Amino acid sequence: MVIVVKVGINGFGRIGRNFFRAALASNANIEIVAVNDLTDIETLAHLLKYDSILGRLNLPVTHNENSITVGTKTFRVFAEKDPAALPWGSVGADIVIESTGRFTKASDAAKHMVGGAKKVVISAPATDEDVTLVLGVNDSAYDPAKHNIISNASCTTNCLAPMAKVLHENFGIVRGFMTTVHAYTNDQVILDFPHKDLRGMFHEEGIAHFMS
């Protein structure tokens, strides 16, 4: 019997759309049943179809007032600010990918479970999560009986930890120093603009230099 994992995505931006494309390309038994994003549905469909980094999605993408269809698969689109108001149970979502970057505290991410989700995977470092997992490093530590709010760690950690694990297991690491080259994020500006961190107010001379 083939078990299909039904997934909802909260935050259909860079990470959310990348997850969608990865799930589609993997041919895994994953069904995206709904996404939640405050952006209008026409724009979401367009951004999913046309990506300046990954190129065009090689399937037709259409939409109506409350759903997007990719090829023959249709998923609901919600526009809720409060995770607790999302009706994940009504669309059968077992797992929610929390990729807004906003709800990284376990108490906030757990609000998805109010609407019916059984597990939440946060696509960033989190606070008070049940476990932080990096595939290929410590994913064997996952315990489905007690790990419901899961952090997938940071992009830097996912790049560094697998390599460090191999080096440490085979040769040993006493101490280390790393430099990361990071692309601009949604939080960084390319014009002078107010920012909660004063270093981040001034276009490319700002916080990008101090990110890591």
Where are these regions (language model features)?
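N-terminal Rossmann-like NAD(P) cofactor-binding subdomain of oxidoreductases
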Residues: 2-203
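Short, intrinsically disordered, charge-balanced linker/junction segments flanking boundaries
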Residues: 206-212
